[in-house]
Amino acid sequence: MLLVVQTALELGFLYAPVALALFLSFRVLDIADLTTDGCFVLGAAVSVTLTAAGHPLLAVPAAMLAGACAGFITAFLQTRLSVPSILAGIVTNTGLYTINLMAMGWRSNESLLGSDTVFTLLRSTGLGGDWYELVLAAAVTLLCAGLLALFLGTRLGLSIRATGDNPDMVRASSLDPTFTVTVGLCLSNALTALSGAMVGQYQKTVDINSGTGIVVIGLACLIIGETMLGRRTVYKGILAALVGSVVYRFIYAVVFYTKVVPVECLKLLTAVIVALAIAAPGLRRWAAFQKQKHSRKEAA
């Protein structure tokens, strides 16, 4: 059972940057960025390829840089070519399939068996003991969350937040929303690629289809965290993304361990939960309207 808890914590922290990325794009910028699935695989592909070449430490920032480039393309399509945000993400995501194959040497998967990773390098130092993978995953994710919180409190970070709230006000303040959207999407996709890079080295493998459904899982983590902690402030939203990711992985582990729901159906269940959570405000308004309508009929 302890192994189940340890694995759930490790995966929770490893996938948390995806939830942070979606918090930045979906909540802060109010943009539905669908580059996530392809960008996750891009990060893993770059990381695994460089790690196999003997550069596990260089692999992580290189993967983040590749993710930022993917975010830049999405932002360019959206801001310069006036492509709707959803379509811009779909176009970039489609193109990334070929880029990811190219990064893996035109193979659909790649393995790191026999290669050193950032995790094995930490194990060789003796730090963390048997929990070395959790220590590294938690340290990287918490560092990213802290830096993101600090960044969103800077002048540029406040401009990005303002762009999501009211782009017209940003223009009236002599700020360029094109620049703030571009920076925000580059940063969010860099976080997604970071998650892919760490997961690739953690699992010692990458597959071209390993990113399928990542955007839905990230949204589920974000929504679970917001349900538990709320999202009244940016800092609470960041914390909610972290907590939600860990809780989601615990739910996944319990389902996998107890077999309450077939594991094959878990992504379907995740999609239903996300759909209901997103539709919740509209459903509440509909329920209130029906209740008011029923009360008027009784009064008449």
Named regions from a protein language model:
Residues T192, G196-K267:
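Transmembrane alpha-helical segments in multi-pass inner-membrane proteins
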